[in-house]
């Protein structure tokens, strides 16, 4: 009985870890889009959460 319980918990943890690992690349891609979305804006313009446009890139966004 304990073996089945441990096996079930292990499988659930594995599924949760895989789901979390799959979500991270999307988060990074979204963060990159935020950082690079300064096309047409002049340098010094605010962008993202706390970023500033420099040479067409949003520097410091999300930090």
From Swiss-Prot:
Signal peptide stretch: 1-21
GO CC annotation: extracellular region
Keywords: Disulfide bond, Neurotoxin, Secreted, Signal, Toxin
Prodomain residues: 22-34
PTM comment, free text: Contains 2 disulfide bond.
One Gene Ontology MF term: toxin activity
Name listed for the protein in its UniProt record: Conotoxin Cl14.11
Organism annotation: Californiconus californicus
Taxon lineage: Eukaryota, Metazoa, Spiralia, Lophotrochozoa, Mollusca
């Amino acid at each position: 009985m304990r073996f089945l319980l441990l096996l079930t918990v292990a499988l659930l943890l594995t599924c949760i870890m895989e789901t979390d690992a799959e979500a991270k690349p999307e988060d990074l891609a979204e963060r990159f889009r935020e950082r690079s979305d300064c096309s047409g804006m002049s340098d010094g313009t605010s962008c993202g959460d706390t970023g500033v446009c420099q040479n067409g890139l949003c520097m410091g966004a999300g930090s």
